[in-house]
């Protein structure tokens, strides 16, 4: 009972400290304003008129001062970055014919890897502990025995995912293809010629002066890189919009070998994609869902271990796949630390920044063994969208950032329902929060993504308006069942 009382007292002490630091300027100004008000009340009308009459300004001085104020204001507003709005987005929902229950996945594995039962057993153990559910999907070409990862099959998957997501976005926003000013496509492992962005331009007959970009090889954090590219372009092109397509094409990247480190992606990655509409038009302010506040990118490619921890390569038999290093979680943790060191001062309240600075100075000057202070990011954000790369990734970030189960619920449920959809997973998570009716006006969202190279990228969004629970979308047919309990091990 005494421990409980102490914890309650400590909680209120911390709340009082936070209130004092975060409202320091307000508390400081209150006595000043009160003093001025009291002095004015003590003065009579004649004294006030006498003070006003003593303030003589020449007309020239007034005009010069006015001109200076107007000039400074004009320069300020012209140099101020344009606000970037997230008008709306759409997540691809695969058809039920692409569903891959555990039983089907393991049956395919036994038939494809019939000469190597140990690899089959390894995949089964991974799947049991993966956090994936029975409704994740793989493209049609992977359902064949053996799989048929041809160029045509890969293009068919790309068209199915991208065009469906774009059609939904057009329907939800009323945007016409001819009105698109900027197009950015990110797909890490499938980079055909002509590019995927050219495929979209051809399909929708987009304008000849459209600014199109196709990003490949950027990994699971590529969606936020695309947002960064779009933000920079929207700063120099006024009254414009940008469409971002984030996806990963699974068809050509199914690994057929026996290397365990390269079999992991087969168990985790599933098909998916998202189409996102950004705009810098002031007229879109009232209908936009979010506005972009901050975007921070961290790249640790100069370090050899970080560079090599996620690598596309051939095994000894010539089978191409993605090799995931055992050091992946350690490297991801280091990248996250570097990223939050940059984004922390931009978003954390003064109370948390002061505690973090005190801890840092204490470790540098007094004792390096002092436990570092982990800022409470729950004071800066109401919602967290952590890349659903796997159960271990979500567990590690929940532990490091001291988040509750509800804070990482969107990530866990997205992994369960859709699997690791690579760069688009952040948008499935945001869609989950909206589908649960939790997104309110002025709520802040932190998107965190990791990618090969090794990269950690963060984006901070602020909700423009309370989001009504959508009646359609990727979660529309299953949101009533979520959240679900996900056991540590699912016996197959």
From Swiss-Prot:
It catalyses: a very-long-chain acyl-CoA + malonyl-CoA + H(+) = a very-long-chain 3-oxoacyl-CoA + CO2 + CoA. The active site is at 220, 299, 383, 387, 416, 420. Inhibited by K3 herbicides such as alachlor, allidochlor, anilofos, cafenstrole and flufenacet. Strongly inhibited by metazachlor and mefluidide. It is a multi-pass membrane protein. The keyword Acyltransferase applies. Residues 76-365 form the FAE domain. The chain crosses the membrane at residues 20-40, 59-79. Its EC number is 2.3.1.199. The keyword Cytoplasm does not apply. PANTHER family: 3-KETOACYL-COA SYNTHASE. This is 3-ketoacyl-CoA synthase 5. The lineage of its organism: Eukaryota, Viridiplantae, Streptophyta, Embryophyta, Tracheophyta.
